[in-house]
Each structure stands twice: as C-alpha cells, then as structure tokens.
Swiss-Prot record:
Residues 95-110 have a biased composition (Basic residues). NCBIfam families: DRP1 (TIGR01159). This is Density-regulated protein. GO terms for molecular function: translation initiation factor activity. It comes from Gallus gallus (Chicken).
C-alpha cells in the first residue's frame, strides 16, 4: 500500500513576505552610514544636526543626496529651508559630542566675580557674617558652608542662591581664610561692606 505524499513546497527566504524581505534588493544589503552621526542616512533627519548630515552627504555622495531630497516631502524641505540661515550660525556655536545628547545647554551669563562680606547685627551684641559671591568663582556653597562651620566652630548655613550666613562676627578673619582656601579669589575681588542692616 503505497500512497503518494506531496512534499510541501518551501518558499525561498528571498521572496518570503512574512520575513519582510524585498524581492527587488540584492542581499546582503549595502547600507550607507553617515559620517557625522554614524546612523544610516535615512535616519539623519531624526538627529539634532540635520544640516551637518545633509552637508556631509551632499559633499561625499551627491547621487544619494539627490535621491533623498527627491523622496522628501515638500513639507520637510520647506521646514529645513526656512531656518537654514540661522540654523547654520547656531551650528557653529554648538558642538555636539557623541552619545545623542541633543542640544547643548547654554552657559550661564557671566556676572562680575566679586565676593562681598557684611556684618549684620542680631539681638543685643550678637552678629552674623554674610558672605555673598562665592558661586561666581564656581565654589560649591555647601562645601564652603561646612568649611566655615568647622574653621570658626560655629553654625553656618546656605540661605540664598549665592549667600552663606555664619553665626558670629568673623569679618576680620574671613578674608584671609577665603584666600587661603580658594587661591583663585584674589584680594581685589573681595569687598568688605562693614556693618549693614538686614
């Protein structure tokens, strides 16, 4: 009793619809990677430096650049073309590092580097010393507060954005202590305001 069993036809992987393979492409595929962002050139439009990627592609592979610009919708081209003058200038100012950080934050505006020291009266014959401006020298205020509290054996606290309050009258000693601990703060940039009201 022999029966004929038909063997199942196995489709070629090359044209298999389920695998997502394209029948018009030669395998293995050759993918062109961008020299700026190191992604395939089709994905450059999703990076923050689109104009740099486009310039690199236009310079090194003009035929691929022509294909990509023809495939782009008019909406995308208009969006890139409008801000190209200002975007080019901004590109010069910003520098992107690898790792996909995106736009780099602008640095804070530079303020004059000046440390002011003031003696403020409290109840009866008690005083507090206020030190302002250490943050302009990029000194950590928490570290400075701990240092002052340990050095003068008293309470010290960071009260404002750039203000340290030390319990006690240390206006005479604090100038020398600041210059000794942080040499970047020179004598000309320290100003003693004397006794001021709170």
């Amino acid at each position: 009793m022999a029966t004929d069993v038909a063997e199942p036809v196995v489709p070629d992987c090359r044209g298999d619809i389920r695998s997502g393979a394209r029948s018009d492409a030669d395998y293995p595929l050759r993918v062109l990677y961008c020299g700026v962002c190191s992604l395939p050139t089709e994905y450059c439009e999703y990076m923050p430096d689109v104009t740099k990627c486009r310039q690199w592609l236009e310079k090194n592979f003009p035929d691929e650049f022509a294909k990509l610009t023809v495939e782009n919708s008019p909406k995308q081209e208009a969006g890139v073309g409008e801000g190209q003058g200002t975007a080019g200038e901004e590109e010069e100012k910003k520098k992107q590092k690898r790792g996909g950080r995106g736009q780099i934050k602008q640095k804070k505006k530079t303020v004059p580097q000046k440390v002011t020291i003031a003696k403020i009266p409290r109840a009866k014959k008690k005083y507090v010393t206020r030190v302002c401006g250490l943050a302009t020298f990029e000194i950590d205020l928490k570290e400075a507060q701990r240092f002052f509290a340990q050095k003068f054996s008293c309470g010290a606290s960071v009260t404002g954005e750039d203000e340290i309050i030390i319990q006690g009258d240390f206006t005479d000693d604090i100038i020398d202590v600041i210059q000794e601990k942080w040499p970047e703060v020179d004598d000309d940039s320290i100003e003693d305001l004397g006794e001021v009201k709170k």
